[in-house]
From Swiss-Prot:
Protein location: Secreted, Cell wall, S-layer
Keywords per UniProt: Cell wall, S-layer, Secreted
Annotated organism of origin: Bacillus thuringiensis subsp. konkukian
Keyword flag Secreted: yes
One cellular component term from this protein's GO annotations in UniProt: spore wall
Function: The S-layer is a paracrystalline mono-layered assembly of proteins which coat the surface of bacteria.
Name of the molecule in the record: S-layer protein 2
Length: 21
């Protein structure tokens, strides 16, 4: 799931990751 987000929308992936951290 993380890979899909990173591939399609890097910005959203970064935001999600930042939220987790």
């Amino acid at each position: 799931l993380d890979t899909d987000l990173q591939g399609t929308m890097p910005e959203v992936y970064a935001s999600e990751r930042a939220a987790f951290l």
